[in-house]
């Protein structure tokens, strides 16, 4: 895990341009402005979603760790991805749930930027890991004879570590730069999480270069990895069409189908939210989009893999002890 140094308080211009700056040690996450009964309903709904997400991804990671037959690079990558999903959803949802029942809905200055850092870093690590998983699929289908010699346990470990390290380094500089910027009151972020878009709206001084830097990094992560995945699966599709056996084509398609579904779900939401932030999106829609990729996507991922993959379904039945449960 990469160390992150943030100033604990921010500077806020409290009145006129010539006035002094006041230290601020917290933000207010406005969230959804609705009646108390609706807040309780949303709390119950998102608590259930969070519990199901943790349970589903935890079950996938656990069965892949327990079943030695699935200790292959493809399934170990999936286990790491499920483990990442647990931490990804936990970087924002617990605080969000607390705020549903809180009157003030505050978050400390350092806590806000740490949430932003971990949310984006874990998301970046997931994007990188999905790309590595696509590369693994390419090797397995397009280079089956060379696959055991290329995708060794040593290379697998290197790729996983690289995804984690690069993910946590990618947004380190932007988060430090944003944390040092003075902002104008009130210290209210009109969002459900500490997102850079609403945070930039509070800045006293326009910082187009920093904003461009952040959006460029986001676009590089999203489009760079997405194009690599598209390229990998173009070659995979070409290899599949050249297979003489329909059984082989069906097996290859079933192996890739789950990963493609997860990639589509993940990148579609990311592109909508971060490629053109603030363009054509109302504040309410931005909150809904954030909830979708922060909670709904991690919930569906274990369902997609468990329903599509026979080996994982068999492993789940074995661990749960009953073939009638799955």
UniProtKB/Swiss-Prot annotation:
It holds the Pfam family 7tm_4. The chain crosses the membrane at residues 45-65, 73-93, 113-133, 159-179, 217-237, 260-280, 288-308. GO terms for molecular function: G protein-coupled receptor activity; olfactory receptor activity. Residues 1-44, 94-112, 180-216, 281-287 are extracellular. Its main location: membrane. It is a multi-pass membrane protein. Glycans are attached at residues 13, 18, 106. GO terms for cellular component: plasma membrane. PROSITE patterns: G_PROTEIN_RECEP_F1_2. Keywords: Cell membrane, Disulfide bond, G-protein coupled receptor, Glycoprotein, Membrane, Olfaction, Receptor, Sensory transduction, Transducer, Transmembrane, Transmembrane helix. InterPro entries: GPCR_Rhodpsn, GPCR_Rhodpsn_7TM, Olfact_rcpt, Olfactory_GPCR1. Residues 66-72, 134-158, 238-259, 309-326 are cytoplasmic. Disulfide bonds join 112-194. It is found in: Cell membrane. Odorant receptor. Belongs to the G-protein coupled receptor 1 family. This is Olfactory receptor 11H1. It comes from Homo sapiens. The gene is OR11H1.
């Amino acid at each position: 895990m990469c160390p992150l140094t943030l100033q604990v308080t921010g500077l806020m211009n409290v009145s006129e341009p010539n006035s002094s700056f006041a230290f601020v040690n917290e933000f207010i996450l406005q969230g959804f402005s609705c009646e108390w009964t609706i807040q309780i309903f949303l709390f119950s709904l998102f608590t259930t979603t969070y519990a199901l997400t943790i349970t589903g991804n935890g079950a996938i990671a656990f069965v892949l760790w327990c079943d030695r037959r699935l200790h292959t690079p493809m399934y170990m990558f999936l286990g790491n991805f499920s483990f990442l999903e647990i931490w990804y959803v936990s970087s924002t949802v617990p605080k969000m749930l607390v705020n549903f029942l809180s009157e003030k809905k505050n978050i400390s200055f350092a806590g806000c930027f740490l949430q932003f850092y971990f949310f984006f870093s874990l998301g970046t690590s997931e994007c990188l890991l999905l790309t590595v998983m696509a590369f693994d699929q390419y090797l397995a289908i397009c280079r089956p004879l060379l696959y055991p010699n290329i995708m060794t346990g040593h290379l697998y470990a290197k790729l996983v570590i690289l995804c984690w390290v690069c993910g946590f380094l990618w947004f380190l500089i932007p988060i430090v730069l944003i944390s040092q910027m003075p902002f104008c009151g009130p210290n209210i972020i009109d969002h459900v999480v500490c997102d850079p878009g609403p945070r930039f709206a509070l800045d006293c001084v326009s910082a187009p270069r920093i904003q461009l830097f952040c959006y460029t990094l986001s676009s590089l992560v999203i489009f760079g990895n997405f194009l690599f995945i598209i390229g990998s699966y173009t070659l995979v599709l070409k290899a599949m069409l050249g297979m003489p056996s329909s059984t082989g084509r069906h097996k290859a398609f079933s192996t890739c189908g789950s990963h493609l579904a997860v990639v589509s779900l993940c990148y579609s939401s990311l592109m909508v939210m971060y490629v053109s932030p603030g363009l054509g999106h109302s504040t309410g829609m931005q909150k809904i989009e954030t909830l979708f990729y922060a909670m709904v996507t991690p919930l569906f991922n274990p369902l997609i893999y468990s329903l599509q993959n026979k080996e994982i379904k068999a492993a789940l039945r074995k661990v749960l002890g009953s073939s009638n449960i799955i």
